[in-house]
Amino acid sequence: MDRVLRDVFDYSYRDYILSWYGNLSRDDGQLYHLLLDDFWEIVKQIRQRLSHVDVVKVVCNDIVKALLTHFCDLKAATARHEEQPRPFVLHACLKDSHDEVRFLQTCSQVLVLCLLPSKDIQSLSLRTMLAEILTTKVLKPVVELLSNPDYINQMLLRQLEYREQMSEHHKRAYTYAPSYEDFIKLINSNSDVDFLKQLRYQIVVEIIQATTISSFPQLKRHKGKESAAMKTDLLRARNMKRYINQLTVAKKQCEKRIRILGGPAYDQQEDGASDEGEGPQSQKILQFEDIMTNPFYRERFGTYMERIDKRALVGFWESAEHLKNANKSEIPQLVSEMYQNFFVESKEISVEKSLYKEIQQCLVGNRGIEVFSKIQADVSEVLRERYYPSFLVSDLYEKLMREEEEEEPDAQLASEKDELGSGGEAGEEAVEGTSGVSDPASFAVIKLRELNEKLEYKRQALSSIQNAPKPDKKIISKLKDEILLIEKECTALQLHMARTDWWCENLGLWRASITSAEVTEENGEQMPCYFVRVNLQEVGGVETKNWTVPRRLSEFQNLHRKLSECVPSLKKVQLPSLSKLPFKSIDHKFLGKSRNQLNAFLQNLLSDERLFQSEALYAFLSPSPDYLKVIDVQGKKTSFSLSSFLEKLPRDFFSHQEEEIEEDSDLSDYGDDVDGKKDSLAEPCFMLIGEIFELRGMFKWVRRTLIALVQVTFGRTINKQIRDTVSWISSEQMLVYYISAFRDAFWPNGKLAPPTRIRSVAQSQETKQRAQQKLLENIPDTLQSLVGQQNARHGIIKIFKALQETKANKHLLYVLMELLLTELCPELRAHLDQFKAGQV
């Protein structure tokens, strides 16, 4: 950095100061050293001020939004005939040439005041002279040059022609190898950094195109209707995935080779690759599945992941694999340990909020362990796409392959892989084998056993969580409540089963009578309610065989309707009904009369041999919870059957309360932002892309594709990639490049560049046409893949036409200049506000 800055200072002093000062003074270098000290002081001031600038915000938000506003204003000003065009409002300083110079003078004066060394600030004449030089000899000529469409067209044409020449040179220099291994060998054997850079670019373009293709909506599978086309589609998707994976490995190898040869370190921040052991790369490529299913390989992969502080991913994969094959009694403890290790203490495994809630439900025994298999699959994809390619080009992989060649543990790999694979399948088959209940008669007993198993699981889970290093108080409280609920459900089921047995054993001996009646509110309306006492006819019966149930008049009417479908003669029996007259209240007379009618109805039912065996009657008289009494007797036999009664119940009726708890629970917000704002920094860029290329309906698809593309190509979220990219373009390495480019442009080969010749209108027009043609011929493949060929073409033409307006270019330059200078020197804001106020 210091060297290129010193070159710029030396050349400037030689050509702009010494050229006239040398004839006036016999100074032996005193002025040079004085000015050099001031120059380094100014550089120090600039560096200090730049350190306080949020470069990511300026580049990704402020500049992009300024460009978006510029294109929106241009679009409105060039509206079609059927629309009303809106005037394009220029920057305040472009009112006339005098105001333009005043604006630049204001900027120059503040810059000089902010950056000049403290010993020189007091000199008004020095500040005035330097500000005037900065205005007339630097800023004004730069603005005139950069806003000139002919200069822009020349730069575009020159750059595009240079890229064409380079591309043609590299196309002649290589052809793709016949196999993937040969392609990797081609990369490792080449020592031309420019060639490798071009090859890397081609690989990235190929990744982009493959990612775009793979993101098209796939045919949905329909159960039992898997067509040949669907199978082909799935096969294509799998092959595309493997192709992207191979390209990613090749890209990593290319970057590694470039780094070895002294080129830029593309992957220095992300893959943790060591410079040690940079020997020839092994040509053997282990498949990801082989690495994960072999403990020896997986251990080395885990060591690599530990180097980049991502060991938890492999650890979770191993824990989930162990959980699949664990004994039933071990599951609560293992689930608790996984929850504590990966989601409480470290939170290194990021999951969506819905999955996190499923984990908590599994922890308390409300769900199975399937959620860990889902997360394991996601973790496996992350390992495959982000870290597996980097591992293949790391020194650890090199050492692993060297050990493989020495020990040849192929037999061990096969046996261990088969053992692990068969163990997983056996576990799955064992789970699937328990899914059905073949004997309906044992349904109630099995339900009770399931409840007891669930209760035991929750008690074990509670014990594990209470003994954990960081017990979750919310989950402990929830578990205790659920244990109480299940205990109550067990008691209720046991009592219901016992009561049902009593009913069956004493069919024909039960009696029911209404002991009292009252008026209740139901949906804002009055409704009579009756208390029905059920007891055995025997005198001195057991106390537990007597109970009382409250029943509304509407429930009596529903019972009458159901039984009438089986016994048509019941239709002749009249039940009390409420008056339909408005404001008619229910009085004691109605309650007494209806009570007598309903008593007679009940006695009639319990004395009829066909009716007292009815399931509907038992459900009506049973005090068991409502979910035990939803029975449809239409078309069923009239004899009562306990097994058929229980079989009609929904399989999951005992877990309905737990599902409600799950719906309302919000035990943790962990993972809420995993997918929510992963592209917030890119939002202005998406808007700018949408405006330039007029995406309309394609906007969401392009957005998703860009996110997926960045994830696959760079192995990170788009937010992180944007931050890293901005950090890279503002790094010291790139600043050196910018200053070197400036130096070489002004002083090619160390000599001051000659002034540019004035070009004719015909020459400018020819350059414009050629530049536009070259632009359209060189639209990036990435862009065409993302937005389509037509949209890409229209967008490029829109950008090119926008650059052909001198005043519009000046307007944009002054907007950006104001934005950047006020970030560098916030003191400038007050002066510019005064300037704009004077324009009104």
UniProtKB/Swiss-Prot annotation:
Organism domain of life: Eukaryota
Modification Phosphoserine, positions: S665
Localization terms from the record: Endosome membrane
Domain named PXA: residues: 1-164
Matching InterPro entries: Phox_assoc, PX_dom, PX_dom_sf, RGS, RGS_sf, RGS_subdomain_2, SNX25_PX, Sorting_nexin_C
Residue runs in coiled coils: 446-494
PX domain span: 508-628
Disordered: annotated span: 404-437
SUPFAM superfamilies the UniProt entry points to: PX domain, Regulator of G-protein signaling, RGS
Predominant location: membrane
Span of domain RGS: 287-401
GO MF terms, alphabetically ordered: phosphatidylinositol binding; type I transforming growth factor beta receptor binding
GO CC field: endosome; endosome membrane
GO biological process, alphabetically ordered: negative regulation of transforming growth factor beta receptor signaling pathway; protein transport; receptor catabolic process
PANTHER family, per database record: SORTING NEXIN (PTHR22775), SORTING NEXIN-25 (PTHR22775:SF48)
Protein name: Sorting nexin-25
